[in-house]
From Swiss-Prot:
GO terms for cellular component: cytoplasm; nucleoid. Residues 5-51, 81-124 form the SpoVT-AbrB domain. GO terms for biological process: negative regulation of DNA-templated transcription initiation. NCBIfam families: division/cell wall cluster transcriptional repressor MraZ (TIGR00242). It is found in: Cytoplasm, Nucleoid. This is Transcriptional regulator MraZ. Forms oligomers. Gene3D superfamilies: Transcriptional regulator MraZ domain. The gene is mraZ. GO terms for molecular function: DNA-binding transcription factor activity; transcription cis-regulatory region binding. It comes from Neisseria meningitidis serogroup A / serotype 4A (strain DSM 15465 / Z2491). Belongs to the MraZ family. Keywords: Cytoplasm, DNA-binding, Repeat, Transcription, Transcription regulation.
Amino acid sequence: MFGGAHELSIDSKGRLAVPAKFRDILSRLYTPAVVVTLESKHKLLMYPVAEWEKVAAQLLNLKVADNPVLRRFQNLLLHNAEILEWDSAGRVLVPAGLRKRVDFDREVVLVGRANRLELWGREQWEAEMVQALDDDPDELAFQLGQTDLQL
């Protein structure tokens, strides 16, 4: 499983050096490739191919005929998905089309989140962390109480 956050830079050619920690997990548990897709204007998602196949199957099973919001979300993820393999230096080429759609450029944070990686712009990541730390702990406790999560 992936974890941790790494501040990185996308070079002028659009390449991102994937930390060895993440490459090792991919090589050991999956294949040395990821599927990258657009989730929002703030973030790209990167899945091991096997995990992406599960997500894609779930997306294809969504009942979207009468729900334009879900249909657009389904299309966003599926239409923008591309397989990336790293080069001999451990870098992946982030597709230009995806780089064009997100509101970050070179300074990024690659975050491990269980079965996937998330690529955030550094400013967006920092804002998300500030918001999470500023959330009302009583409200969080209430919301968590409505779930089955046990920490």
